[in-house]
């Protein structure tokens, strides 16, 4: 089975939905942010603060190179992974990429008490979310499937991903 790759903006449900999909299919979940944290032995926030976004993205690329070679897993990526076309190509070689969409307003609600997101630290959170989403949306739209997490619970989103994925797999 091809990997199920989840991407989308922070707060779109990648980790939660990824966990549900992996549990339902009885396969492993690999969270690229968790892999980066293991490599640096720092939180994402600390990595950005100490090393900057450039070093974070370099590490993210190494992690993508490694996890994209795995088989039969759910891969939950960081929200900015799609900004590098090489990351997308690596993930697509052995996977199907699902973009989890959430509106800026819902992302703000989901992240309102979360102060660990380095790209939302300065200025108005909603403005930052909208600005970053506008930059990333063309990249997200290049994914294989879009799942709207504004209108689906995590459980229903997981079921929809599994349904799409199994239908696609049966045609291979």
UniProtKB/Swiss-Prot annotation:
This protein's GO CC annotations: cytosol
Cofactor(s) the protein needs: Mg(2+)
Cofactor note: Binds 1 Mg(2+) ion per subunit.
Domain of life: Bacteria
Binding site for Mg(2+): 15
Gene3D superfamilies: P-loop containing nucleotide triphosphate hydrolases
Class of the enzyme per the UniProt entry, highest EC level: transferase
EC number: 2.7.1.71
Reactions accelerated catalytically: shikimate + ATP = 3-phosphoshikimate + ADP + H(+)
CDD domains per record: SK
Compartments it resides in: Cytoplasm
Keywords: Amino-acid biosynthesis, Aromatic amino acid biosynthesis, ATP-binding, Cytoplasm, Kinase, Magnesium, Metal-binding, Nucleotide-binding, Transferase
Residue numbers binding substrate: 33, 57, 79, 136
Metabolic or biological pathway: Metabolic intermediate biosynthesis; chorismate biosynthesis; chorismate from D-erythrose 4-phosphate and phosphoenolpyruvate: step 5/7
GO MF assignments: ATP binding; magnesium ion binding; shikimate kinase activity
Binding site for ATP: 11-16, 117
GO biological process: amino acid biosynthetic process; aromatic amino acid family biosynthetic process; chorismate biosynthetic process
InterPro entries from the UniProt entry: P-loop_NTPase, Shikimate/glucono_kinase, Shikimate_kinase/TSH1, Shikimate_kinase_CS
Family to which this protein belongs: Belongs to the shikimate kinase family.
Subunit comment: Monomer.
Cross-referenced HAMAP family: Shikimate_kinase
Function: Catalyzes the specific phosphorylation of the 3-hydroxyl group of shikimic acid using ATP as a cosubstrate.
Name under which the protein is recorded: Shikimate kinase
């Amino acid at each position: 089975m091809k990997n199920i790759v989840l991407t989308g903006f922070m707060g779109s449900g990648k980790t939660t939905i990824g966990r549900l999909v992996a549990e339902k299919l009885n396969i492993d979940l690999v969270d690229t942010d968790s892999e980066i944290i293991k490599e640096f032995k720092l939180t994402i926030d600390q990595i950005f603060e100490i090393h900057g976004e450039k070093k974070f993205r370099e590490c993210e690329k190494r992690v993508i190179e490694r996890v994209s070679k795995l088989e039969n897993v759910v891969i939950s990526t960081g929200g900015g992974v799609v900004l590098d076309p090489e990351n997308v190509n690596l993930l697509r070689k052995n996977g199907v990429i699902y973009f989890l969409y959430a509106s800026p307003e819902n992302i703000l609600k989901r992240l309102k008490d979360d102060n660990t997101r380095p790209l939302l630290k300065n200025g108005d959170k909603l403005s930052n979310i909208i600005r970053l989403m506008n930059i990333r949306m063309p990249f997200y739209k290049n994914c294989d499937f879009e799942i709207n997490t504004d209108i689906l619970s995590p459980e229903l989103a997981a079921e929809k991903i599994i349904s799409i994925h199994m239908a696609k797999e049966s045609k291979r």
